[in-house]
Every structure is written in C-alpha cells, then in structure tokens.
A protein has these predicted regions:
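Donor-sugar nucleotide-binding helix/loop cap in glycosyltransferases
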Residues: 1-285
C-alpha cells in the first residue's frame, strides 16, 4: 500500500487569525486540551478547543503535545519574532508549513498535485473527484468518506477564499485569507482559480527558506524541483526565476543560478542554514 492520507479533525472550523498564538500560549502554560477548564481558558466551545489543537498540529506548531522550534521562534512571548502574525512573511511561512507537514493531507494534495494537474481553474466537484482518485491509489478505499472530503474542501476554501462582501465579519477571520491564493469567479459560484496574478506578493526569503528545507542535504536543485515548490506558492515560471535571482543577488557567496542550454539549476556553494535566512528576514522588520 502507498501513503495513507488523513482527512477531518478540524471540527468543520477554519483556522482563525489568533488561534495559533492562543493555542501556543495555552500549551506553554502547561494546560491540557482534554481538561475540563480548557474551554474556559481558551474562551471557546469544546469543539473549537479540538479545532485549535488540530490546527496547531496541521501548521507544524505542535508535535507530540509540545511546541515546535518554529512555534517558539514565532510566538514566544519574550523572543518571538511575530507573535501576533502581523507580517506578511509569517503568513507565507505558515502556509508553507501547512502544506509541508501533511497532517491535513488535503493541502499538499491541493496545492501541489491538483494544481499541477488542473493548471489554474477548477471546481469543488473536480477537487472532490481528484481526492477520491488519489485516495483510491493508496489502497485505503475504506477510509474514503464523501461527506468528510466535502467538509475538508469547504474548510480549505474558507481558509483561502475571500468571502463575498455581504457576509458576516466572522467570515473574514481566517488566518490565511490575506495571501489571496485562491479566488472565486465573479460570474458564477462554481468556478475557482489559483490566483497566480492577484495573490499577495511572496516574500523571497520565505521561498528561499522553503527551498533549503526541501532540498535536505543536496547542493544542486534542478528547476523542476523549484517549480514543484513554486506551485505551492502560486508562482508562475517567470515569477519563480525572478524570485530566485533576487535571493541569488542577495547571497552571492552561498548561491549561484545557471541556465546552460535550457538546463536551469540552483547551486548551493556552501551549507546554508535555513534558520539564518529567517533570522535575517525578521531582523529587518
């Protein structure tokens, strides 16, 4: 059997803007999500308590009940770089972690595999069929539940698609809305798009962080590998090249980009610590 996908767990709640910080502080205070007073401390209902824990795990902020290194880096009350998520770069970083961790399988499948297959235009129904097919390929057919997948799709879209302006303010509280990565057609309610042209500007350092994180120990990254990452950030091929050239210019001692006879590659000339990239970015804020 192949990789086993996981769906549901969010209790049908998208991730609200302050939930990660609220959940992080809760865990750092040695509180227990299963305790009766969790609803009092967090100020939400029981299902939302479960949802907050789920999103902490899905965004890679919590592992085995403990805050991760990146969670401390961002949210620590004393030294956290962006505890209240005021910087656009933090949103891009959290988006990357949501896709990367695969606690919520739908995000990697959607932004990587489905995006590559469908190009930029899609419907909910097409995404549903795609997820059913991908799940069947794993051999775990008995784990597929149509209603569960529909709820996952609905929550994913709530996380990323800006609601119509006649909706309640509560609908505008999703953490990742400001990235504008997905948009809905103005002509109908069915067609959706990966917002390649209208998304918010990607912070180059966050993409570089993702490249270093993804490449592991490799010192040469082929262009196809970069394009796979670019899909996650809804970057076009030309935007990808521009972004790579930006950070190659900034770090000439560590990086070189070549295009020899159409073979494009990014070379790492020496070891490059991804955490130093983040520290340099947040230092200039």
């Amino acid at each position: 059997m192949n990789e086993r996908y996981t769906f549901s767990g969010h209790e049908s709640f998208y991730c609200k803007s302050l939930w990660l910080k609220k959940g992080y502080d809760f865990v750092k205070s040695d509180k227990n999500f299963n305790a009766e007073d969790a609803v009092v401390y967090l100020g939400v209902g029981k299902n939302m308590v479960s949802a907050i824990r789920y999103w902490l795990r899905a965004f890679g902020m919590l592992e085995e009940g403990n805050p991760t290194e990146i969670a401390d880096f961002l949210f620590d009350n004393k030294n956290g770089k962006d505890p209240y998520i005021e910087d656009l770069g933090t949103l891009w970083l959290l988006h990357y972690y949501l896709v990367k961790t695969e606690v919520a399988s739908i995000y990697k499948l959607f932004f990587s595999d489905f995006h590559k297959e469908k190009n930029n235009e899609f419907t909910r129904e097409q995404l549903q069929h795609f997820l059913k097919r991908k799940n069947a390929e794993t051999g775990y057919n008995n784990l597929y539940n149509e209603n569960t997948i529909k709820r996952d799709i609905g929550v994913l879209l709530q996380n990323y698609v800006m609601p119509k302006r006649d909706r309640p303010n509560e609908d505008f509280a999703a953490l990742l809305l400001n990235l504008s990565l997905i948009r809905q057609s103005e002509d109908d309610n069915k067609t959706l798009y990966f917002n390649m042209n209208g998304k918010n500007e990607l912070v180059p350092e966050i993409f570089l962080y993702a490249v270093i994180d993804d490449k592991k120990e490799e010192m040469i990254v082929p262009f196809d590998r970069l394009m796979d990452l670019a899909l996650i950030f809804c970057l076009s091929k030309s935007e990808l090249v521009d972004t790579v050239l930006l950070f190659v210019e900034k770090y000439p001692q560590q990086l070189r980009y070549t295009d020899d006879g159409g073979i494009k590659q990014l070379f790492f000339l020496k070891d490059f610590n991804k955490n130093e990239v983040l520290k340099n970015y947040y230092k200039k804020r």
